[in-house]
Regions:
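Structural signature of the two symmetry-related core transmembrane helices
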Residues: 106-123, 336-351
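A membrane-interface helix-boundary motif in multi-pass transporters
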Residues: 105-108, 141-143, 208-223, 417-437
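Helix-to-loop junctions at the C-terminal end of transmembrane segments
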Residues: 87-103, 321-333, 419
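Multi-pass alpha-helical transporter architecture, strongest
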Residues: 124-131, 226-236, 431-464
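Helix-loop boundary and gating motifs at the non-cytosolic
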Residues: 19-82, 271-278, 282-300
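Intracellular juxtamembrane helix-capping segments at the cytosolic ends
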Residues: 59, 166-179, 375-389
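C-terminal transmembrane helical hairpin of 12-TM major facilitator-type secondary transporters
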Residues: 335-377
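Juxtamembrane intracellular "pre-TM" segments in multi-pass secondary transporters
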Residues: 13-33, 242-275, 463-464
């Protein structure tokens, strides 16, 4: 028998296998490229979320300082943003989906709106001085001083909301365009973690000083927001997009044709109407407590410092859950995550209505509210990206926000008026949250069954 000659060992190292790559449209990422993308996007989100966490509660405290009613607070903080979003969100998103330029289709809109939001936050910060100076200049009666300040505050808030709504209409679209679909749930988990860190920093260090030092808080965060988002836009690159769809035969040019196309795309299929309703009701369910939580804390004897610590504790819990919830959304799908969270939230809100009797019980239910709403906004964050058509994502997302805006326009003042009539009994905010969560859960079950019929997690394709 012939023995084959021994093969001498090779001195060359083994050839490594091909590195894994992720793709989002025409963009391709290695692990390092994906990490760089995440870092810049998360930096922009940190600036964004710090603005979102700071502006509403500080403005709420300013409104209370100048003796605004609950009705006016609901009008400012919920109905006004909804009214702006009702027409501006669809317009910006429709144009963004169809825009093609050297900077992409999302980044130009963010570069324009960020400085406007910064200026508006500075306007909010200086509203008391501007209002006082205007009142003195016009020689109005002393009794109208607070009203003058509130009007100036409202004008600055309106400009702020115009910029925020316009930016929000395209920020989610930017994520949809540059983040690979395979990791979108985990990406939103990290987004949520950054949001929570921003909330923890604000509520631990700043909320207790907001009544006396709202000027440096609002102006400083406004400058950080403008600079942070602009820097993100300069460092993140969009890919190439196919040309927008040509107008349909017989479609009228201009605004009328665009409105008809928008309405036909978004509202002609019952499936998407159920999706919009379920998402709007779910988000609206968190609004009653969110809108009046500062006033509720004071009415139940909770100081602003203790209130801030409850928020920080809830944010810390949500922070620990953020990445696991994002992984679960990738693994089990955002539709299932939304349904489970809403069911638990409805039960907790019922406990809040019947069980809150003082600061300790309010703090416990409020802690659960923040934690569970955070679970929803993390686990269901990618719901739109997973259900809407990819190339028309911003348009469909704005249609969902339009439905939410219609609810907010009426709900904010109605809830405030109800609380004014009920002697500011803020337990009713928990009852309203329970009812809306149950309605959102029912609509979500309809969506879930139709999603399964369209292929479910394995074979779903968004109908167009």
């Amino acid at each position: 028998m012939t023995v084959p000659p021994a093969v001498p060992p090779s001195d060359s190292p083994p050839v490594p296998g091909p590195r894994r790559r992720w793709q989002a449209g025409t963009l391709t990422y290695t692990a390092g490229g994906l990490a760089v993308l995440f870092c810049w996007m998360l930096w922009g989100d940190f600036a964004w979320q710090l603005k979102e966490r700071a502006a509403p509660p500080v403005v709420q405290l300013m409104l209370r300082k100048f003796q605004a009613s609950d009705f006016l607070t609901g009008l400012f903080l919920l109905s006004l943003p909804a009214a702006v979003g009702l027409f501006l969100g669809p317009l910006i998103s429709y144009r963004s989906d169809r825009h093609r330029g050297p900077w992409g289709r999302r980044i130009p809109f963010l570069l324009i709106t960020s400085p406007i939001a910064t200026l508006a936050m500075c306007g909010l910060a200086f509203s008391p001085w501007i209002g006082t100076a205007l009142h003195a200049r016009m020689g109005w009666a002393p009794a109208s001083l607070h009203l003058t300040v509130i009007v100036v505050l409202g004008l600055s808030w309106t400009v702020f909301e115009f910029a925020t709504v316009a930016a929000n209409a395209v920020f989610g679209g930017l994520i949809n365009d540059v983040v690979p679909r395979e990791v979108i749930g985990r990406f939103f988990g990290m987004f949520r973690a950054v949001s929570l860190l921003a909330g923890m920093l604000f509520n631990f260090y700043l909320i207790g000083h907001a009544k006396e030092h709202f000027l440096p808080i609002l102006a400083g965060i406004g400058l950080l927001y403008g600079g942070g988002v602009v820097l993100m836009c300069l460092r993140v690159k969009e890919g190439d997009y196919p040309p927008p769809e040509p107008p349909a035969p017989g479609q009228r040019p201009g605004l009328v044709g665009a409105v008809r196309t928008y309405a036909r795309d978004c509202f002609s299929r019952p499936y998407y109407l159920w999706v919009f309703a379920s998402m709007a009701l779910a988000q609206l369910a968190f609004s009653p407590v969110n809108l009046f939580c500062v006033y509720a804390a004071e009415s139940f004897g909770l100081s602003m410092s203790t209130y801030g610590r409850y928020l920080v504790a809830a944010y810390a819990g949500s922070l620990l859950l953020a990445y696991p919830l994002g992984w679960m959304a990738d693994r089990f799908h955002a539709v299932r995550m939304a349904l489970g969270t809403l069911a638990v939230y409805a039960a907790v809100m019922a406990v809040g209505y019947f069980g809150i009797v003082g600061p300790a019980s309010f703090g416990a239910v409020f802690f659960a509210h923040v934690l569970l709403s955070g679970c929803y906004f993390t686990g269901a964050a990618a719901l739109g990206q997973m259900l809407f058509p990819k190339m028309k994502f911003a348009q469909f997302a704005s249609a969902g926000n339009l439905i939410l805006a219609l609810g907010n326009i009426g709900f904010g003042p109605a809830m405030g008026l109800l609380l004014d009539q009920l002697g500011h009994d803020y337990r009713y905010t928990f009852a309203a949250g329970c009812l809306l969560a149950l309605l959102g859960l029912l609509a979500g079950v309809v969506v879930y069954r139709r999603w399964l019929a369209l292929g479910g997690a394995a074979g779903y394709a968004a109908p167009e």
